[in-house]
Curated annotation (Swiss-Prot):
One Pfam family cited in the UniProt record for this chain: Prismane
Residue numbers of Cysteine persulfide PTMs: 405
Cofactor(s), names only, from the UniProt record: [4Fe-4S] cluster; hybrid [4Fe-2O-2S] cluster
Designated gene of the protein: hcp
Any single biological process term in GO: response to hydrogen peroxide
Enzyme class: oxidoreductase
Protein name: Hydroxylamine reductase
Length: 549
């Protein structure tokens, strides 16, 4: 087994016996086999696009299948094998179409001709291919590092692209880049600089993918507005929806309307409460339950209703709650109930609804608690004059963007302590599940502006970027000259894609933690430090002093 795509990878240098996420070596090997076959499909799709043959079905499939190989998404070899079979079927049908259409049939590479041996061990085949992937990168560890950076970043781009197309937002250039980059991973002739350029291109395309998803959310549900979200449950039957997929959350709300079931969000779906059309159209979307993904074994065990996982992060479930747990889309785990999509792409959620009706639900009220969400770009930039005046008069000294992924490592308490120690004349922007380290802190206000503003999900890094660019334009300076410090936490591959976007934009002095990626070699890290001043977090006191100096 070889996997080092997440922050919690074993001993900080890769998982070789069993995944720290709970992924078995067998699942890891089949994921590697799937990725290899997706690269072969991408080769054929690029040829089809050159010849004006429709590829949208394959484009979306590649994104979903890459999504399935992300951390804490799919632990089920049966499900992954179905993705693998679909991949080969789509590839062969498209090859046949090309051969029948073109006067001169294409000459296919080994990559696009690879045929898994269904009678033999898929695990062994996957292990062989990943070893070949490494060996074909020669002995240059820096090139291997950058190849892995590109691959992991592509997974993040694919996940955002998949969600955006659910909401009707697509850009063929995004699909084409994903496929072209997948094929380039087979190249052995690219220089170190060319791999650096490709990694930064991943960041550029991810910016576009996040823009598409932002458009899908805001055009469908309206721009987020400041909204108070209850953290205390109310009496009645309940369904908990976890993950990131707001389109599927809406589908669940539609299918539970008039059924006297209260719907709660979990994890990265907290920002959904800020979208006005969701709140207006579905009054049974009530509150938020639980905190970040790594606490789900405790949160899910206590929740007295059905639970639906729409995306990452799924942990191996305990038997105390696995019977009330349902998965959809790319998410799968052996023995959990999977709800397949219908022709519309929306599952029939009846099994989860029936389970919720059979369960006790919440039987008593608790003391009211709440948090605020909805401070996306429209909200913040609508008061830009007030913000600018606050900075000019010295009432606002500095902005901190403290966000990213949460995780189980003890070192992540750094982020809680840092936010608690941020001076009272500074504002904290946050996004993604890293916020759960401090999302309920009462930090007060500066001149009517909340000192803690939740910008949204991890993909709302796009919104945070627009806020930073808007402030920079207002002050007539570059982003690196405004009083803003980025202190980020990472865990999985979406965070890698977002980091590459920030580097593509030339943003300097990012502090990253709790540890640096295992797949980044010392030479690549030195390049990032020399050119972008990227640095690991130290202590809250030291980093605050450096940022405010």
């Amino acid at each position: 087994m070889f996997c080092e795509q997440c922050e919690q990878t074993a001993s900080g240098n890769g998982c070789h016996q069993w995944g720290a996420c709970g992924k078995s070596p067998e699942v890891n090997a089949v994921q590697d086999l799937l990725i290899y076959c997706l690269r072969g499909l991408a080769t054929v799709v690029l040829k089809a696009r050159e010849n004006h043959i429709p590829t949208q079905k394959m484009d979306v499939f590649i994104c979903e299948a890459l999504f399935a190989t992300m951390t804490n998404v799919n632990f089920n070899n049966k499900s992954l094998t179905e993705y693998l079979k679909t991949c080969i079927n789509l590839r062969e049908k498209l090859k046949q179409t090309l051969e029948e259409t073109l006067n001169t049939p294409p000459s296919w590479s080994d990559l696009s001709n690879y045929q898994p041996d269904w009678e033999d061990s898929l695990v062994t085949q996957g292990e062989t291919l990943v070893h070949r992937f490494i060996s074909r990168s020669s002995n240059d560890l820096d090139i291997i590092s950058l190849k892995l950076t590109v691959l992991y970043g592509l997974k993040g781009v694919a996940s955002y692209t998949f969600h955006a197309q659910e909401l009707g937002q697509e850009d063929e250039k995004v699909y084409q880049f994903i496929e072209d980059a997948l094929v380039k991973l087979e190249r052995t002739d690219l220089s170190l600089q060319e791999w650096i350029d490709l990694a930064l291109k991943v960041g550029e395309i991810n910016l576009r993918a996040m823009e598409l998803l932002d458009a899908g959310h805001t055009q469908t549900y309206g721009h987020p507005t400041p909204t108070q979200v209850p953290l205390n449950p109310k009496k009645g039957k309940a369904i908990l929806v976890s993950g990131h997929d707001i389109r599927q959350l809406e589908a669940i709300l539609q299918q539970t309307a008039d059924k006297d079931i209260t719907v709660y969000t979990h994890g990265e779906l907290l920002p959904a409460h800020g979208y006005p059309k969701l709140k207006q159209n579905y009054p049974h979307l009530y509150g938020h339950y639980g905190t970040a993904w790594q606490n789900q074994t405790k949160d899910f065990a206590k929740f007295p209703g059905a639970i639906i996982i729409t995306t990452n992060c799924l942990m191996p479930p305990h038997e105390t709650y696995d019977e009330k747990l349902f998965t959809i889309g790319p998410v799968s785990y052996p023995h959990l109930t999977y709800l397949p999509p219908t022709e519309t792409g929306i599952p029939d959620y009846s099994p989860a609804i029936k389970k919720a009706c059979l369960m006790p639900g919440f039987t008593e009220e608790t003391e009211p608690r709440h948090v605020m969400v909805g401070f996306a770009r429209n909200t913040v930039l609508s008061v830009s004059d007030q913000v600018i005046e606050g900075v000019k008069t010295g009432k606002i000294r500095h902005f901190f963007l403290v966000g990213g992924c949460d995780g189980a490592k003890p070192g992540r308490t750094y982020y809680t302590e840092l936010v608690e120690k941020v001076p009272s004349d500074c504002i904290v922007l946050t996004l993604a599940c890293g916020k759960f380290r401090f999302f309920d802190k009462q930090l007060g206000e500066i001149e009517g502006l909340p000192r803690l503003m939740d910008v949204g999900q991890c993909n709302d890094a796009y919104s945070a970027i627009q806020i930073a660019l808007g402030l920079a334009n207002a002050f007539n300076v570059s982003v690196n000259e405004i009083p803003l410090s980025l202190i980020l936490s990472w865990y999985e591959q979406k965070a890698i894609a977002v980091l590459l976007t920030l580097l593509y934009l030339g943003i300097q002095n990012i502090r990253l933690g709790p540890t640096l990626p295992a797949f980044i070699t010392p030479n690549v890290l030195q390049f990032l430090q020399d050119n972008y001043h990227l640095q690991p977090i130290t202590t809250p006191d030291e980093d605050l002093a450096a940022c405010l100096n």
